[in-house]
Regions:
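Short beta-strand elements in bilobed, periplasmic/extracellular small-molecule ligand-binding domains
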Residues: 71-92, 152, 198-216
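Flexible loop/hinge segments that line or gate small-molecule binding clefts
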Residues: 117, 122-162
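Extracytoplasmic "Venus flytrap"
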Residues: 44-70, 81-90, 186-190, 240
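Short, low-complexity disordered leader/linker segments with a strong preference
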Residues: 1-44, 69-73
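Conserved small/polar residues in nucleotide/adenosyl-binding loops
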Residues: 237-243
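Short, well-structured alpha-helical segments in soluble
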Residues: 87-106, 117-120, 220-232
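An alpha-beta-alpha
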Residues: 45, 63, 154-202
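Short beta-strand scaffold positions
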Residues: 47, 108-109
Length: 243
């Protein structure tokens, strides 16, 4: 019953769009962390975040603020276990497994790798998963083609308006020919967005030069190499916390 009540409240939170509040504030980098706030006789929620990044932090804060507005507040009737994967997909999977073992009432997953890990870990545990900051839930197999829920998971998308970005780049850089895109090869949403850029680039007389990276350790070298080949550069997916 408690999970059903929480699910209803979270539906209201999703409707208000509070989980999509992803901005661009800056934060410092820290080691993998676990912050737990305690509350007596209330809800337990595990929050898994893929990286230390302002926009992802805003998603987490917006999620908690939305719950607070619905009467579920950290330190009163809500216990939050926040863990950060520090851009490591293996760590994201371990975090998800730990939330299932802890029998959290719900898992909030921020960014695609955490969302996929949470869904895979919780699918047989009767623990609902709410995700945010997922650009392409369908490609990530977190939603059906019509946008409906897959299993016990729902959430919000931060899909980019690709064509509008191309229009803006053309207006700002009328002589530009090549756009560089740095993306994470292991993220389905990142790959699908690059494909969309490629499909639309010709319409605005652009050529897309893309470079895939496997880990955050590859970013600096890949970005330095890519910037020498293009007129402007776009950072995608997990690359955003460094580019």
């Amino acid at each position: 019953m408690k999970k059903k009540v929480l699910a209803v409240i979270l539906t209201a939170v999703c409707t208000m769009g509070l989980m999509a509040g992803c901005g661009n504030s800056n934060v410092g980098n820290t080691n993998t962390q676990k912050n737990a706030s305690s509350a007596e006789d209330g809800y337990k929620i595990g929050i898994s975040q893929f990286a230390e990044h302002g926009s992802l932090d805003n998603c987490r804060e917006g999620f908690l603020e939305g719950l607070k507005e619905e009467g579920i507040e950290e330190g009163k009737n809500l216990t939050v276990d926040y863990q950060n994967a520090q851009t490591d997909t293996g760590t994201a999977s371990t975090i998800a497994d730990s939330f299932v073992s802890a029998k959290e009432d719900l898992i909030c997953a921020i960014a695609t790798p955490c969302a996929q890990s949470a869904y895979n870990s919780a699918m047989n545990a009767d623990i609902p998963v709410v995700y945010t900051a997922v650009s392409d839930p369908v490609a990530a197999k977190l939603a059906n083609e019509d946008g409906s829920c897959v299993g016990n998971v729902t959430g919000s998308s931060d899909v980019l308006p690709v064509e509008e970005q191309l229009k803006m780049i053309r207006a700002m850089l009328p002589d530009a020919k090549k756009i560089g895109i740095l993306y994470t090869t292991s993220e389905t949403n990142s790959c699908s967005t690059v494909k969309e850029y490629q499909e639309l680039a010709g319409k605005y007389d652009f050529e897309i030069v893309d470079t895939g990276i496997n880990t955050s350790a590859d970013i600096d070298m890949a970005a330095t190499d890519l910037v020498s080949k293009v007129d402007c550069q776009i950072g995608r997916a997990s690359c955003r916390e460094r580019v």
